[in-house]
Amino acid sequence: MINLKLLETNYDEFVKKLEGKNVKASLLDELLHTFNELKQKRKALENFQAIQNAKSKELGVKARAGEDVSELKSELNLNKAALADADEIVKQYEEKLEQISFSVPNITDDDVPFGKDENDNVCIKTVLEPTKFDFKPKEHWELGESLGWLDFERGAKLSGSRFTVLRGMGARLGRALVNYMIDFNSARGFELVNVPYLVSSNTLFGTGQLPKFEEDLYKVRDEDLYLIPTSEVPVTNLYNDTIIEAEQLPIKMTCYSACFRQEAGSAGRDTRGMIRQHQFEKVELVSITKPDQSEGVLAEMISCASDLLTSLGLPHRHMLLCSGDLGFSAAKTIDLEVWLPGQGKYREISSISNTRDFQARRAKIRFKDGKKNMLVNTLNGSSLAVGRTLIAIMENYQKADGTIEIPEVLKRYM
């Protein structure tokens, strides 16, 4: 959630930044109005509580002195009723404030470019030149089917569209990538964690998926459990409602998991191959930091994922996302896009974000700063998306005869 006190004192800045995320000023007007109304209603409630306490004390004194307290009892009863009404009004305004604030995304960092969509993202770095061939390179689905690595037909038979079966060398390469990514990230100081794939609604609320993006989640019928869309959700929430000692920060973690997404709104996009799946694997980085550490840790996470791609010999570029392409919880995001010669374009393979204190406010993750409890900053990003890395290797390491060379660093993992 955004900081409502900052919204109050920096209203114009919030309007400008959130306009870049397609948030109308009228929503912020309503949010601020409700926030101010709630403060007034709380003052009224506190006034009734003070009157109740004072009159209750007065009643006790007069009763012990043997005085007539019938009129005072009537006043107390009237005030008690008014107090109950005021308390109910406060609860209604608190609920209204929550409903509005839960739908407002994070504000952007100052260096995030204003833009409408992915076409306005800015390339800030290119690593390795796009792979050149003396033959026309094939796309991954053609290579995968001809080699027997990717079985789209049986994936669809088992589960429907956007599911794939990996077989033989395809499955072995996928497993090798997971182990290599975990080892690479661990060597960079990220602690390996293993988490549940089913989480509660409160957990998803903490990282911002609920309530706004429920349509993209898979829910267990009749239970408060959802399949995770990314391991960012359970890993970040390991510290939900926790006060961390300052000397423990930063906390840096890596996690392998399967991920599950409905892909609502993606109809007609990437219908062939493995680019966009309902179930996919990812190795994630999650960091929890002090506010003054998060920029440095963001750079570490970007470097980790980029160096991992470089070690695999995969050409890629760093894209600074514009305001209109930023995620709900993100204040700043760098996408790493890998070159796919079969498609003849770059495709996202990692998205690394600093959410500042947005998720921490929702999940109540704090650290002890002297005598004060302060909100942490949380960061997350892929290092890397396993399926897309497999695709990138297939397309960049293909040979004219349709076979695929295995990158040197992966051979001992095969």
Curated annotation (Swiss-Prot):
Record EC number? 6.1.1.11
Q: What subcellular compartments does it reside in?
A: Cytoplasm
The alphabetical list of record keywords is: Aminoacyl-tRNA synthetase, ATP-binding, Cytoplasm, Ligase, Nucleotide-binding, Protein biosynthesis
Q: Which family does it belong to?
A: Belongs to the class-II aminoacyl-tRNA synthetase family. Type-1 seryl-tRNA synthetase subfamily.
Give the binding site residues for ATP: 261-263, 348-351
What does the record give as the organism's lineage? Bacteria, Pseudomonadati, Campylobacterota, Epsilonproteobacteria, Campylobacterales
Name of the molecule in the record:
Serine--tRNA ligase
Checking NCBIfam families in the record gives: serS
Any one GO CC term of this protein is:
cytoplasm
Q: How does it assemble?
A: Homodimer. The tRNA molecule binds across the dimer.
Give the function comment from the record. Catalyzes the attachment of serine to tRNA(Ser). Is also able to aminoacylate tRNA(Sec) with serine, to form the misacylated tRNA L-seryl-tRNA(Sec), which will be further converted into selenocysteinyl-tRNA(Sec).
